Amino acid sequence: MCAARLAAAAAQSVYAFSARPLAGGEPVSLGSLRGKVLLIENVASLUGTTVRDYTQMNELQRRLGPRGLVVLGFPCNQFGHQENAKNEEILNSLKYVRPGGGFEPNFMLFEKCEVNGAGAHPLFAFLREALPAPSDDATALMTDPKLIAWSPVCRNDVAWNFEKFLVGPDGVPVRRYSRRFQTIDIEPDIEALLSQGPSSA
């Protein structure tokens, strides 16, 4: 069993994990976000839904951040090589290419990582174990098996860019959404979690 899966198996919440910010610096412990509702997405700057999803992530962070939502984006190049820029190039790609027009994410972006396979970030190994399939499309699979560029392949793998994981204020994953489910449409589920108030976990 790889280290990522061992870490995922031992974890009880996302608070066991950390990730390095895209801008550099020390890793951010997700434990520092205790009591917040988290929306975690694997992102890519050259995907067909980049403009839609990035702008909707910004909108949710703008509207619901003051009430306790934290949006987290994890660039990943495992799906159609649609995040092939280096870490230091991603923000400029977003600003000038897609979405473009001076776009700047107002949410936390982390360094590129893998979300599937033996090299998967431990956070994503945990999320996939906790929520094996998207709630809106339990049969979601990668549409073209020739594009699978990781091993081992598991039934609970992330199928494409912009899958979403909603995590409650106790750090426990609540719901997973497919790439087809628009980010902005998660708002009612986020509102429901925010209305529960912060957890003491």
From Swiss-Prot:
InterPro entries: Glutathione_peroxidase, GPX_AS, GPX_CS, Thioredoxin-like_sf. GO terms for biological process: arachidonate metabolic process; glutathione metabolic process; hydrogen peroxide catabolic process; lipoxygenase pathway; response to hydrogen peroxide; response to selenium ion. Keywords: Acetylation, Cytoplasm, Lipid metabolism, Mitochondrion, Oxidoreductase, Peroxidase, Phosphoprotein, Selenocysteine. During periods of oxidative stress, Sec-47 may react with a superoxide radical, irreversibly lose hydroselenide and be converted to dehydroalanine. Its EC number is 1.11.1.9, 1.11.1.12. One of its GO terms (molecular function) is glutathione peroxidase activity. It is found in: Cytoplasm; Mitochondrion. The modification N6-succinyllysine is found at residues 86, 112, 146. The record marks 47 as: Subject to oxidation and hydroselenide loss to dehydroalanine. The keyword Transmembrane does not apply. It catalyses: 2 glutathione + H2O2 = glutathione disulfide + 2 H2O; a hydroperoxy polyunsaturated fatty acid + 2 glutathione = a hydroxy polyunsaturated fatty acid + glutathione disulfide + H2O; tert-butyl hydroperoxide + 2 glutathione = tert-butanol + glutathione disulfide + H2O; cumene hydroperoxide + 2 glutathione = 2-phenylpropan-2-ol + glutathione disulfide + H2O. The modification N6-acetyllysine is found at residues 86, 112, 146. It is an enzyme of class 1 (oxidoreductase). GO terms for cellular component: cytosol; mitochondrion. The modification Phosphoserine is found at residues 32, 195, 199. The keyword Lipid metabolism applies. Homotetramer. Interacts with MIEN1. Belongs to the glutathione peroxidase family. PANTHER family: GLUTATHIONE PEROXIDASE, GLUTATHIONE PEROXIDASE 1. This is Glutathione peroxidase 1. The lineage of its organism: Eukaryota, Metazoa, Chordata, Craniata, Vertebrata.
